[in-house]
Amino acid sequence: MKPDRLNALTDGVVAIAITIIVLELPLPEAPTLTGLRAVAPMLLTYLLSFINIGIFWNNHHHMLSTAEHVDGRVLWANLVLLFFLSLMPFVIRWIDEAGFEALPCAAYGIVLVGAALSYQALEAAIIRLHGRDGALARALGSDLKAKLSALAYGAAIGLAFVDPTIAIAIYVMIAAAWLVPDPRIEHQQIAEHRPRPDKDG
């Protein structure tokens, strides 16, 4: 099976999740700077969530560009990733209703670590399908950055019960680390399509 339908489904779910989040944003109670400041924390949380979803979507796009075809394992791994991304509006609304308390902030981290681990499972499924000599396996190597990010999310979940602001700070730092698109896959694809020198020339 070609990955086109998988990409289309992912694009649709991501677009819906982002739309739901922005529709759930509270409006300022007064048309003043004071009213805007009152909802500023939720606006920043929306921004962080938008960036996180965008990071997963961007990297997913690059990852799927290496797949010539997909199988059942890839389809299910992708569905698990979409499940966690689709939970983002739920945890954002919980934070809006409850405030930046320990449990909602920890739940935000659980969604992020779930998305991170399912993304890695999707990577593994594609590598299993295309082999260790496939473009994705050669581009990623050990993928230490992704593994460290998942560990950091796990630490943030625990720290949310100590101080939720520490957890939020960790979420922001991880997002900042991934804000620049990972160039490894693009570099690998460029290298594969670079014309080889003519030995007879």
Predicted features, each with a name:
Residues 1-201:
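Multi-pass alpha-helical transmembrane bundle typical of ion/small-solute transporters
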